[in-house]
Amino acid sequence: MPKLKTHKGASKRFKKTGTGLVVRNRAFGRHILTSKPHKRKKKLHQSVVADKADQKVLKRMLPY
């Protein structure tokens, strides 16, 4: 069986935790920040666990 290749786009956007969950960064936190409240901007810089529906696909994209 051939080696599994890591999806490079996914590897730059997602990280695997020690328990096997996939973590992602939030969107909308890079620019046009003047109209967003401080509380929202703080939350946008926290990483979150990826959606349950996407976990199976992401685990296949990030085999190692």
Curated annotation (Swiss-Prot):
| Single Gene Ontology MF annotation | structural constituent of ribosome
- Source species, domain of life: Bacteria
Ribonucleoprotein as a keyword of this entry, yes or no, is yes
Membrane-crossing ranges are none
Assigned keywords, A-Z: Ribonucleoprotein, Ribosomal protein
Q: Which InterPro entries match?
A: Ribosomal_bL35, Ribosomal_bL35-like, Ribosomal_bL35_CS, Ribosomal_bL35_sf
Note one Pfam family from the annotation: Ribosomal_L35p
From the UniProt record, give one GO term of the biological process aspect.
translation
Q: Which GO terms describe its cellular component?
A: large ribosomal subunit
Task: State the similarity comment.
Answer: Belongs to the bacterial ribosomal protein bL35 family.
What is the protein name for this chain? Large ribosomal subunit protein bL35
Species source reads: Solibacter usitatus (strain Ellin6076)
What would be the name of the gene that encodes this protein? rpmI
